[in-house]
C-alpha cells in the first residue's frame, strides 16, 4: 500500500495532481481510492488530496489515510506542507518548494512568514524534506 497526499492552496492544482496520479496507478492495475479535503479552497484556503494505492491484489478499503501513515506528502506550498505533517509516517518524505504563496485572501497576516525558515525548522525536526 502506498499513500500519497498532496497539500496546497485553492487553485494550485492539488486535486488535479491527485487525479492524474490515481489514473496512472489505475492504468498499471493498482487499486486506487482518492479523497479531498477542500474547505475554503475557493478563497485561497487549504486543499488536501489523498491517493491510496494498493498493488495488484492489495485491497484499499478507505479513501482517507490515517494520521502517521502517508509515505509521501507533495506540498505545493511550504506552509501547507507543515500543516500536513501529522499525516506523514516517520520514514516518509515531504516534497516542498522553496518559495511560498501566502493565502492573503483568507488572512492578510499570513504573508508574514518565511518559507525558508519553515523548511529549515522541518529539516531540524528530522523530517526528510526534498
Describe every region a protein language model picked out:
Residues 1-130:
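Active-site cofactor/cluster-binding pocket
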